[in-house]
């Protein structure tokens, strides 16, 4: 029996959420250990589990993986979500890096002072509408397929949907000028494993609240 991947992170989205999305889309069951105390974090460091002293940490296939980008690349390749050749793979990388840049503007916002937080979220919505979503709308139009790369689901599609939903939590009508992205959102959301992940009771995490921010600050001492 294959051992389930184990995820070590806070009980919130942060940099782990995209990893949860990939595993859930691949239909892979996983376990989670939530960091709630400084002692848990220090033990992981003492045991040599954190390569650069940082989480996310994923235990999978007999390995302890850190660094979000490396983990996502490994999972995408392992679960056939990384294209059919090198040219498709580099496009998937470009698109995923773009959506990650957009999402990080939102992920980091709760840790800022109230006014800075609102400014960061407003900037994220503006960038989504003026920089990122026009690009993906054009990609879908030019490619003429149901997916961003090739003719099958990839990491790029999954992470774009994650980004869309995250921006919509800040500004619900953000896709109003992007009909192809609206259709894309509906289409990808209805893939069975993704549809299940989007239902209440899944391992998808809610938007961060004050408690999550306090726990992260306490554990990481910042």
Swiss-Prot record:
Pfam families given in the database record: GST_C, GST_N
GO cellular component, one term: mitochondrion
Locations listed in the record: Cytoplasm
Domain GST C-terminal: 85-208
Location of the GST N-terminal domain: 3-83
Biological process, per Gene Ontology: cellular response to lithium ion; glutathione metabolic process; response to herbicide; response to nicotine; response to zinc ion; xenobiotic metabolic process
Annotated catalysed reactions: RX + glutathione = an S-substituted glutathione + a halide anion + H(+)
Main location: cytoplasm
In-chain residues carrying the UniProt-annotated modification N-acetylmethionine: 1
PROSITE patterns according to UniProt: GST_CTER (PS50405), GST_NTER (PS50404)
PANTHER family: GLUTATHIONE S-TRANSFERASE, GLUTATHIONE S-TRANSFERASE A4
Subunit structure: Homodimer.
Function: Conjugation of reduced glutathione to a wide number of exogenous and endogenous hydrophobic electrophiles.
Protein name per the record: Glutathione S-transferase alpha-4
Species the sequence originates in: Rattus norvegicus
Source taxonomy: Eukaryota, Metazoa, Chordata, Craniata, Vertebrata
